């Protein structure tokens, strides 16, 4: 893909010149450009998680995560089109899991639900959020993912409580 080639058109030589370090310093810290990208992805993931609001609605948590992701939209586009795609997807899933898990565990009904059942709810929401992100990436980030997620969150507000009530989990 052209995104992948854009990432790899940059050579170590270009990177060390732009950063003002020598090649030995680069290779001391990174095996190659993909390992540098992995480190960047890990740092971006940590920053997204770190900047999430503690006490908030699911919509607020999702919005905060997506706004943080949007700050690096161009870089993410190139990484997603590169050989680091699988690694990036795993980090995205980590973000989705964290957003979902912290939200569900903060709900008053979560303590009344069996751990096994709670994990089903978390898994469902996490995978839904991840799927929405992958769809956005596969559409070349061509629509406003923040607004898209706000609409979805409003459409399904209260649905987890209803599921828990329907199956007499609470």
What function would you assign to each model-found segment?
Residues 1-8:
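Short, small-residue-biased leader/transition segments that mark boundaries at the very start
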Residues 85-110, 116-133, 161:
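Amphipathic alpha-helical packing segments from all-alpha helical-bundle domains
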């Amino acid at each position: 893909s052209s995104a992948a080639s854009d990432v790899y058109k940059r050579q170590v030589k270009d990177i060390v010149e732009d950063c003002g370090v020598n090649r030995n310093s680069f290779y001391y810290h990174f095996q190659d450009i993909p390992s540098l990208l992995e480190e960047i992805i890990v740092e971006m993931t940590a920053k997204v998680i770190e900047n999430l609001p503690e006490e908030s609605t699911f919509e607020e948590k999702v919005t905060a995560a997506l706004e943080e992701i949007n700050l690096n939209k161009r870089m993410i586009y190139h990484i997603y089109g590169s050989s680091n795609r699988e690694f990036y997807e795993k980090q995205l899933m980590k973000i989705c899991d964290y957003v979902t898990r912290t939200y569900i565990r903060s709900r008053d009904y979560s303590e009344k639900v069996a751990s096994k059942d709670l994990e089903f709810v978390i898994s469902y929401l996490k995978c839904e959020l991840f799927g929405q992100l992958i769809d956005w990436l596969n559409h070349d980030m061509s629509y406003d993912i923040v607004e898209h997620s706000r609409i979805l969150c409003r459409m399904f507000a209260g649905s987890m409580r209803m599921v828990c009530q329907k199956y007499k989990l609470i």
